């Protein structure tokens, strides 16, 4: 999924929260029940497998609460309507905690939905020529992520101390004199057919529409040690609860890994 850096908490969002959570009690106090927020679609399909594993292995009843986007799950978890959620990576959580004063913590890794470099012109990093044009996302989180991936491949060097949000201005060494083109994430799959673009760095969210597989069709790709691995998130006050631990163990199971491999066409790399 694509997680943007800035989110608006509007009156409409609060109304939507009320609709989504209407009729729902506070998060469960039953050790054999857990309420987990997920994003509708493929990610919920993966969570459904974890739900089945939790019931079979631990007798844990998992109630999945679906959301249409990343605006509300942290708010609902922080205020106790959910026990946990599973949809985001650590940089997103850290930003949301800082922006809204949430007391949320990561309790374990789930999947890396990897960003990768794709091309219809080359097959390996060694084939990237002097002066090649590399298209990357232009939103701050994913732009920084793409630059860090280029650095991992030793194509550029970034200024130290920039953390997870470097910009093109922080490139200190560019031995192949790559031309960095910043575009909206949704446009990146289309530029694979642009004769002026040699490589495009694209998130799993947008590459899925092309039928390409991050694992099988990319020139280079993030690995499971990526700081952008997705996480199971709970509150400070319930992070050690037995139901949270059992759901994490269920999610980090071979059954879930196998299902995610199929559901995401190789675009979900186990991060545990």
UniProtKB/Swiss-Prot annotation:
A lipid is attached at residue 24 (S-diacylglycerol cysteine). The keyword Lipoprotein applies. PROSITE patterns: PROKAR_LIPOPROTEIN (PS51257). A lipid is attached at residue 24 (N-palmitoyl cysteine). It comes from the Bacteria. It is found in: Cell inner membrane. It is a lipid-anchor. This is Lipoprotein 28.
């Amino acid at each position: 999924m694509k997680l943007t850096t800035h989110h608006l908490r509007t009156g409409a969002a609060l109304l939507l929260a009320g609709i989504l959570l209407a009729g729902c009690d506070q998060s469960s106090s039953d050790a054999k029940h857990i309420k987990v927020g997920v994003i509708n679609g493929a990610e919920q399909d993966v969570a459904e497998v974890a739900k089945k594993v939790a019931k079979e292995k631990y007798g844990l009843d998992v109630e999945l609460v679906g959301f249409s986007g990343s605006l509300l799950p942290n708010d609902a978890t922080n205020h106790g309507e959910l026990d946990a959620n599973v949809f985001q990576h650590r940089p997103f959580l850290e930003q949301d905690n800082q922006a809204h004063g949430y007391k949320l913590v990561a309790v374990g890794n789930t999947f890396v939905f990897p960003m990768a470099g794709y091309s219809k012109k080359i097959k390996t990093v060694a084939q990237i020529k002097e002066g090649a044009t590399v298209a990357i996302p232009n939103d701050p989180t994913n732009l920084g992520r793409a630059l860090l991936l280029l650095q991992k491949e030793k194509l550029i060097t970034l200024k130290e101390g920039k953390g997870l949000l470097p910009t093109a201005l922080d490139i200190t060494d560019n031995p192949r004199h790559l031309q960095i083109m910043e575009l909206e994430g949704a446009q990146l799959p289309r530029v694979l057919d642009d004769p002026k673009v040699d490589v495009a760095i694209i998130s799993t969210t947008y590459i899925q529409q092309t039928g390409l597989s991050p694992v099988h069709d990319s020139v280079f790709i993030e690995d499971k040690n990526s700081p952008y691995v997705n996480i199971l998130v709970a509150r400070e006050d319930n992070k050690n609860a037995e139901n949270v631990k059992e759901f994490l163990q269920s999610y980090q199971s071979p059954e879930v890994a196998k299902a995610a491999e199929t559901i995401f066409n190789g675009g979900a790399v186990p991060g545990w």
